Every structure is written in C-alpha cells, then in structure tokens.
Design a protein with these regions (language model features):
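Fe(II)/2-oxoglutarate oxygenase catalytic core
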Residues: 1-158, 166-187
Length: 187
C-alpha cells in the first residue's frame, strides 16, 4: 500500500487517438449543453457559481466506445496498478458526462462525493473519479490538487483518482480556446 495521496492519482496515456478525440468533439456540437451547477445534497439545492463550464449527458455516436475505454481504464487502475486483495470489484460506472470550458470559465474547488447521480436505479456513492481529455488546443484549464499540484491532461489521456474528501480539486480558468473533457464516476 502506498503512503502518499498523490500515489493514487493515475494518468493513463493514449486511451483515445487524436482522430477519435476530434470526432467526438464534432459529435458534441449538436448536443444540448447547459451551464454546470453544483448540487448541495444537505440543503437540497443547486447553485450556479458564476464562471462554470457547460456540460451535457447526451449520448453521442461514440458513447459506447467511450464507455469501453473508461471500463478498461478502471480495470487498469483497480486490478493492475493497485491490485488490493480487499478491493477487486465495483458496482458500475456512470455514462460519460462531457464538460466544455470556454474562455474565462473554471470549476471551483470541490470533491466528487456526489449523491445526486446515484439515487435512482443505480445506487451508491462514487469511489473513483475518471476525467478524460479530448483536446490540447486551449490555454489554462489546469486541474489542481493537493493544493498546488498541477495536472495537465493531454488529449487522449485519462486521469483517475479516489472520489472523496481527501482529493479536492479545481480547474483553473481557460484563458484561450475551448477545453473539452469527459467524466465518469465509479461506484
């Protein structure tokens, strides 16, 4: 077992080709985008923060392929990288959520202890967060953890980390271009 929190943040390179990333971004052009809102479970309220990105849960023609890529990354993280005898399975993972960060948008610091996505047929609290990047042609938009460790996720890469209070993270403002990412949560 590792003793540093950063040891449980894993970047998996080359899970998508550049051409597939570009194809997915084109597919996203027709999706129904909405401004991201934070849901506060204790209060039962949702709030805009002011400079939030847009997101969509719409399926694209590549959604099934993306789910397979996410599954392989989860498998690598749980069964190959860490391989703990007491942690060998999970219930499932969410369909990809896409985020689109235009210039001057950001994601405030938070942890992925999400309740609202797992209250229907799928029940649970996320145990792992999966973030994949679809492009590099933007500036800014760095993911920050611990509180000053910078992760620049390249197009085609996935970053996986535990979804709990020990892993607060934020996305710095995009200063040029548009940043496209997808997210999934393992429960």
């Amino acid at each position: 077992m590792k003793d540093k929190l950063q040891d449980y943040v894993l970047t998996i390179p080359n899970v998508l080709t550049d051409s597939l990333c570009e194809k997915i971004i084109k597919e996203l052009e027709v999706c129904n985008w909405k401004t991201h809102i934070f849901y506060y479970h204790r209060e039962g309220t949702s709030k805009l923060q002011g400079k939030d990105p847009e997101n969509t849960f719409d399926k694209t023609p590549s959604s099934q392929l993306l789910q397979e890529v996410v599954w392989k990354a989860i498998h690598k993280y749980i069964l190959e990288e860490f391989n703990f005898p007491w942690f060998e399975s999970w219930e499932g993972f969410s369909l990809p959520k896409f985020n689109r960060y235009h210039e001057n948008t950001l994601m405030k610091e938070h942890c992925d202890h999400i309740h609202s996505q797992f209250e229907g047929k799928r029940r649970g609290i996320p145990i792992l967060s999966v973030i994949g990047s679809l492009n590099n042609n933007y500036e800014g938009g760095e993911l920050i953890m611990f509180p000053d460790k910078e992760y620049k996720i390249k197009a085609g890469e996935i970053l996986i980390f535990p979804s709990n209070f020990l892993y607060p993270h934020k996305v710095m403002p995009v200063t040029k271009g548009t940043r496209y990412t997808y997210l999934s949560w393992v429960y």
